[in-house]
C-alpha cells in the first residue's frame, strides 16, 4: 500500500457510492489510511429497515439499524471521511481518474468503490414496511434465521431461490412453507430438495 499521493488535492483519492455498513466501513479504513475519501449516500440502506440486528459484532444485546448507521457515520467522520447525501447519476473517465456527477454537484476521484448493496422487491401486501419494522417480515434468511426458531415461516419469492432459502431456514424451524411469486418454475432438483426437507411449496 503506497503512501498518500501528493498530487492535486482537489482530486479525491476514493469516492464510495453507497452509505450502508459496507460503504461506511470502507470510508473508515480509507480515512485511517490517510486517504481523502467521500461517501455519496442516497439514504436507502437496507440497514435502516432493521428493527434490531443481533449479528453485528460488538453489540451483544443487538442494535437498531439506524443506530448502527449513525455510529458508523460518526466514526468515519471522526477520521476525516466526507459524507454527502445524493444519488450518483453519471460517471465518466477523467485525466485524473473519474468525473462523477451527483445531483447538482460534480467531483473528480482517482478510484471508486461501489457499495450500493441490493434493492429488495417487496411483496405486494398491505403495510409491508411497518411489518418489516416490527420484524414480522424479514428480508434476509442469513441475518434473521436465528430469530425464527421454531416458528411458522413462509418464504416468498421465485420458486428455485425461495426453496434454497427455505432449506437453509430448516436449520431453525421445521415449519417452512414456500409461497411462490408467479409460476412455480423450478428444476426437478429444487422440488426434490423441498420434498426431502418436508417443505411445502
Spell out what each predicted region is.
Residues 42-45, 119, 159-160:
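Short glycine-enriched loops at secondary-structure junctions
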Residues 30-31, 52-55, 126-130, 168-171, ...:
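Short, glycine/charged-enriched secondary-structure capping and boundary segments
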Residues 11, 16-39, 139-188:
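Rossmann-like dinucleotide/flavin-binding elements
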Residues 48, 122-123, 163-164:
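Glycine/Thr-rich phosphate-binding loops of Rossmann-like dinucleotide-binding domains
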Residues 36-49:
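N-terminal glycine-rich anion-binding loops that anchor highly charged ligand groups
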Residues 48-106, 185-199:
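N-terminal Rossmann-like dinucleotide/flavin-binding domain of flavoprotein oxidoreductases
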Residues 82-84, 138, 179, 200-201:
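General small-molecule cofactor/ligand-binding pocket signal
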Residues 1-15, 38, 83-151:
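FAD-binding core/adjacent interface of flavoenzyme oxidoreductases
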Amino acid at each position: 500500500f503506497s503512501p498518500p499521493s501528493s498530487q492535486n488535492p482537489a482530486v479525491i483519492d476514493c469516492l464510495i457510492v453507497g452509505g450502508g455498513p459496507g460503504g461506511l466501513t470502507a470510508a473508515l479504513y480509507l480515512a485511517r489510511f490517510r486517504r481523502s475519501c467521500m461517501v455519496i449516500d442516497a439514504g436507502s440502506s437496507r440497514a435502516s429497515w432493521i428493527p434490531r440486528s443481533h449479528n453485528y459484532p460488538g453489540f451483544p444485546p443487538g442494535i437498531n439499524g439506524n443506530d448502527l448507521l449513525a455510529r458508523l457515520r460518526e466514526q468515519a467522520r471522526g477520521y476525516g471521511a466526507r459524507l454527502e447525501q445524493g444519488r450518483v447519476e453519471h460517471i465518466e473517465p477523467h485525466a485524473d481518474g473519474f468525473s462523477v456527477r451527483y445531483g447538482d454537484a460534480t467531483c473528480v476521484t482517482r478510484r471508486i468503490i461501489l457499495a450500493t448493496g441490493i434493492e429488495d422487491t417487496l411483496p405486494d401486501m398491505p403495510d409491508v414496511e411497518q411489518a418489516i419494522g416490527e420484524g414480522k417480515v424479514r428480508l434476509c434468511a442469513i441475518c434473521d434465521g436465528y430469530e425464527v426458531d421454531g416458528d411458522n415461516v413462509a418464504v416468498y419469492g421465485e420458486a428455485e431461490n425461495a426453496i434454497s432459502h427455505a432449506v437453509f431456514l430448516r436449520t431453525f424451524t421445521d415449519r417452512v412453507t414456500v409461497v411462490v411469486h408467479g409460476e412455480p418454475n423450478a428444476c426437478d432438483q429444487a422440488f426434490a430438495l423441498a420434498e426431502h426437507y418436508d417443505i411445502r411449496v
